[in-house]
Amino acid sequence: EQKCLFTKGQIIEIFQDIINPNAPKITQVVNEGQLSIIKPNVAHTMVFTKDTTFLNLVRGERDHENYGITHTIKHIFVDEKEKNLLLEYYKFDCRSCGNNDLKRVVSLGYQPLANNLLKKINEKCELYPLEVNYCNKCHNCQLSVSVDPRKMFTNYLYTSSTSKVFREHFINAAKQYFKHLKLNKKKSYIIDIGSNDGVALKPFLDLGFKKVLGIEPATNLAKIANKKGIKTFNGFLEKKNLKKIKKNADLILASNVFAHSDKLKEMAECMLDLLSKKGTIVIEVQYLMNTLKDLTFDNIYHEHYNYWSLTSLVNFFNQFNAKIFKSEKVDTHGGSLRIFVKKDKKVKIDSSVRKMLKDEENFGIKDFKTYQEFGKKIYKIRENVLRNFKKIKEKNKKIIGFGAPAKATTALNFFGITKEIDFIVEDNKLKHNKFIPGVKIPIKNKSQIKDKNNTLLVLAWNFYNDIKKNNSKLSNNFLNIKDLESNN
């Protein structure tokens, strides 16, 4: 073991266990005054982000029993391109509060961009660290890198309307907001941020609302929405675009997009700028507490820069003198959090906020040990899945995946599962004849399933019951990928 004390500067260290073939490549920031500890049998290198001075700490005299014997072997595992990617995209401070002493929760290795499916099997794709860090000041969780959003959202293949579950979710949500927020069908102006193909705004039009606007950066999805008659602005929500967007919204929706912004404060400022004095912002995010409790690590991918609890969201919005006045849990994405926000500092805070904050504190949302335990359990899950996969293949079972959501890219790349799955079928036609990046598993139409004796492994596990019910003719054997995670 070797220790280095950094007396000046900053580095990104990259290391990988060379004994364990499944070990991920991991990055870690070392700041001034901190130690770098290099374990035996580990490939290790440093990317210097500043002028840096460090001391090698050695026990005792240099003249020891191994003196003069080479115990470090040259092993290049970070090239110039990777170094430049790290320097460009690494996030050194908390995007919520600015704290630069972030703690590592889990590393899922270097992974491709989850929704950037390959058009050809030999097409190259860039890999980026997929790692979650924790801020012990505001309790925000975020990725260690922030990939340029234009690489992920300019041409987006995920269409929310493909899922009946999501269509029904947004229909019910629209009815709820109409009733409880006392909206007016003729006068109320509704904006949806990251509106996709218009799935959340269509129910408002169906209810008779006249003034709706979607804001969607993916050109292909904005075109789909506009063709449906759902007025959509094609672009990111950022200050330079505000002059192109009508203001004084009575309701602003942000469903599963608030985690998708690296420029988080700019996004919040834009939303508050577009909001009328008495208007309401409703935000839905995947709920961090569900991720930690249910071990749904596959909800981690590069599009999701942030992972939110109510605790961290309250801390965030307090910076803008905006108040979360109501909170509730919803079932989407394996467990989500919905919050209601107003500019009015005197707004009455619903008891749901106090109760949820107390529940989070009791769970340990402010205790780093909670996050460390989560990380340990995720590595154990990988061991279990690989062992259980091997058992299935030993029975000469042909495995076909069902569903190619972003979570499938994360899980399959983390597990290192490639040829063990023959192919994947998908309801979304935009994904047909493409390949999962990294593992290069082909995605096909359901018509390619010819034998009911095949095992259908449901990768879109949050829709398992619906998939099994609606596709019973395809297979006699459905298996939820979550069932492979147990230690059987």
Predicted ranges, named:
Residues 265-280:
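A short glycine-rich, Lys/Arg-flanked "PGG" loop and its adjoining helix->strand segment in the class I
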